[in-house]
Amino acid sequence: MTNIRKTHPLMKIINSSFIDLPTPSNISSWWNFGSLLGICLIIQILTGLFLAMHYTSDTMTAFSSVTHICRDVNYGWLIRYLHANGASMFFICLFLHVGRGLYYGSYMFMETWNIGVLLLFAVMATAFMGYVLPWGQMSFWGATVITNLLSAIPYIGSDLVQWIWGGFSVDKATLTRFFAFHFILPFVIAALAGVHLLFLHETGSNNPSGLPSDADKIPFHPYYTIKDILGILLLILVLTCLVLFSPDLLGDPDNYTPANPLNTPPHIKPEWYFLFAYAILRSIPNKLGGVLALVLSILILAFIPLLHTSKQRSMMFRPLSQCLFWILVADLLTLTWIGGQPVEHPFIIIGQLASILYFMLLLVIMPITSLLENNLLKW
């Protein structure tokens, strides 16, 4: 008799995705982040669901409902901080996952990569709207500043902003719709993640060498299930330590002040995971130019496969490209730091130089270096 997991319509999908899936035998811990992102999404949906049971999306009561969750709801403080810091863990895993893809040439799976870029945009949109919901000072002013950027779009800009706001400023209508979108988008993300996996399983996983691994495949279970469980345990350990020991480490103190449209905070800045893009936005003195640079800072990922000039897929055997990759990482960390600093000398010029370097590395320097490496090797 054939095993039920291979015949049952639902079980065989799970079987071919997580049990009998042929997997390269040499994939490293950098391949753990896909499963970690899945766990992060599950944590966010579950904690978010329980928060939504007690949250009210009204400007008069939103802030106090979050306070009520933290003070009066059983383990409400735990659920709230798991959700807030879970978002940070989500983005850490996302950045590492994308970085892995860039380093090892996983972007050559075009469909998988493009769905991934779409997922990144969806997660960023969800996180932005979630940050508005507690209705603190930084929530309100962050929403005002970022939505106002759309007014830079020629002709339709100001109408578009008012349409998104549902009025002439960020108000009750804005908060209500942001809550609705923040609730629905994670399910869209889950569906997109399913499509992401579907396309990945069409080709099979890449591996550190960037070479075809058809000759050396092993079943996903038990080898990689146990490896994923280790990664998940480490993720939960880090998240738990963050939540229980310093839950406000990554947050902004201004968000403990209720939103006040009459009082602007001295430094408006988004959550840490958007600071690199915010620094790029601020480094261009023109409003429309800044908005375009902001969008392109993420959208540029979609063009990476077209800029691949190397004869090798992975950077494993390309020391010059490796150096440039780590310069890119350092540059992104610099941008993240600059995004959190006030707009004054010397931060302005550092931000501008780091922004130029970011685009130059991805669009010009790395493709040319790859061509150089092709000629350095005897093919």
Swiss-Prot record:
Source species, domain of life: Eukaryota
Cofactor note: Binds 2 heme b groups non-covalently.
Gene Ontology MF terms in the entry: metal ion binding; ubiquinol-cytochrome-c reductase activity
Gene3D superfamilies hit by this protein: Cytochrome Bc1 Complex, Chain C
Cofactor(s) demanded: heme b
GO BP annotations, alphabetical order: mitochondrial electron transport, ubiquinol to cytochrome c
Residues spanning the membrane: 33-53, 77-98, 113-133, 178-198, 226-246, 288-308, 320-340, 347-367
Record localization: Mitochondrion inner membrane
GO cellular component, one term: respiratory chain complex III
Membrane topology: Multi-pass membrane protein
InterPro entries: Cyt_b/b6_C, Cyt_b/b6_C_sf, Cyt_b/b6_N, Cytb/b6-like_sf, Cytochrome_b, Cytochrome_b_C_euk/bac, Cytochrome_b_N_euk/bac, Di-haem_cyt_TM
This protein's UniProt keywords: Electron transport, Heme, Iron, Membrane, Metal-binding, Mitochondrion, Mitochondrion inner membrane, Respiratory chain, Transmembrane, Transmembrane helix, Transport, Ubiquinone
Sequence positions that bind heme b b562: 83, 182
Binding positions for heme b b566 per the UniProt entry: 97, 196
Note: Heme 1 (or BL or b562) is low-potential and absorbs at about 562 nm, and heme 2 (or BH or b566) is high-potential and absorbs at about 566 nm.
Function of the protein: Component of the ubiquinol-cytochrome c reductase complex (complex III or cytochrome b-c1 complex) that is part of the mitochondrial respiratory chain. The b-c1 complex mediates electron transfer from ubiquinol to cytochrome c. Contributes to the generation of a proton gradient across the mitochondrial membrane that is then used for ATP synthesis.
Subunit text: The cytochrome bc1 complex contains 11 subunits: 3 respiratory subunits (MT-CYB, CYC1 and UQCRFS1), 2 core proteins (UQCRC1 and UQCRC2) and 6 low-molecular weight proteins (UQCRH/QCR6, UQCRB/QCR7, UQCRQ/QCR8, UQCR10/QCR9, UQCR11/QCR10 and a cleavage product of UQCRFS1). This cytochrome bc1 complex then forms a dimer.
Protein name per its UniProtKB record: Cytochrome b
